[in-house]
Amino acid sequence: TPNKNLERVAQTLKGIPCLLEIVGPLSEAQENVLNENKIHFRHEVGISNARIAEKYQEADVLLFPSTYEGFGMPILEAQLTGRPVITSDYSAMREVAGDSACLVNPFSVESIRQGVLKVIQEDEYRKELVEKGTENVKRFSAHNVAKMYWALYQEMHATQH
């Protein structure tokens, strides 16, 4: 889908030796953009949750410069497996990632490229993102989310009485 920003990802990765793993369907136009930018890629469709977990384990980094997401679950999934995340400084992605990801402008190829290069070239920065990501995931544990909902319920109840 267009919000996944694959065209800008292809432009971003042009000339950077890598294998882009894509989970989900690709349109012919998207495949053409990847090929035009000489991006080495593989994609899988309709895979199990277990296979998705394997994909994260096999990855070096999650590049997720989406222009719109309802929540941004891939951020947490990647962080749960100890992977650094590059994502949009935008909408739900910023809220989910906080300071635990390299935040980029999803509408700027140059911004995304700078983020990618920083994460792959700077070992200390990458380690810092992994450590912060491990902590970030804890914010979204079932226990912590239940506590947040309970606090919200109490606040709403208090304002009605």
PLM feature segments, named:
Residues 1-161:
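Carbohydrate transferase catalytic cores enriched for Leloir-type hexosyltransferases
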